[in-house]
Amino acid sequence: MKAFIVLVALACAAPAFGRTMDRCSLAREMSNLGVPRDQLARWACIAEHESSYRTGVVGPENYNGSNDYGIFQINDYYWCAPPSGRFSYNECGLSCNALLTDDITHSVRCAQKVLSQQGWSAWSTWHYCSGWLPSIDDCF
């Protein structure tokens, strides 16, 4: 009986753990948030390789004890405040949990800040996204 109650509780909580987007839904939402259209295919590629388009992903612990959060796998040592309270530069000025929600606004704004300060190579998956990319024109 306890196992059943736990399963029901987890099933009800599942929507709180983020959502899975696709290339086009991400491109449209980012466009609506003002991201330049010529960047959308590259962002979609990064999201695909970093999180498989999942907003609620917390990556495994990195070599320095940090973790990466959300659809763009943003690092908690530099960019957001981890729930553990561990030191962070928190350059985006937000909790890492804000990067795990269905609303990707915080993730997009923080990712844009990462891009402006470190460029595309800030993402370890960048090499998958540096050449030819599929067009996102069919998404609009």
From Swiss-Prot:
InterPro entries: Glyco_hydro_22, Glyco_hydro_22_CS, Glyco_hydro_22_lys, Lysozyme-like_dom_sf. Residues 1-18 form the signal peptide. One of its GO terms (molecular function) is lysozyme activity. Its EC number is 3.2.1.17. Keywords: Antimicrobial, Bacteriolytic enzyme, Disulfide bond, Glycosidase, Hydrolase, Signal. GO terms for cellular component: extracellular space. Found in the midgut. The keyword Signal applies. One of its GO terms (biological process) is killing of cells of another organism. The active site is at 50, 68. It comes from the Eukaryota. It catalyses: Hydrolysis of (1->4)-beta-linkages between N-acetylmuramic acid and N-acetyl-D-glucosamine residues in a peptidoglycan and between N-acetyl-D-glucosamine residues in chitodextrins. Disulfide bonds join 24-139, 45-129, 80-96, 92-110. PROSITE patterns: GLYCOSYL_HYDROL_F22_1, GLYCOSYL_HYDROL_F22_2. Residues 19-140 form the C-type lysozyme domain. Pfam families: Lys. Belongs to the glycosyl hydrolase 22 family. Unlikely to play an active role in the humoral immune defense. May have a function in the digestion of bacteria in the food. This is Lysozyme D. It comes from Drosophila melanogaster. The gene is LysD.
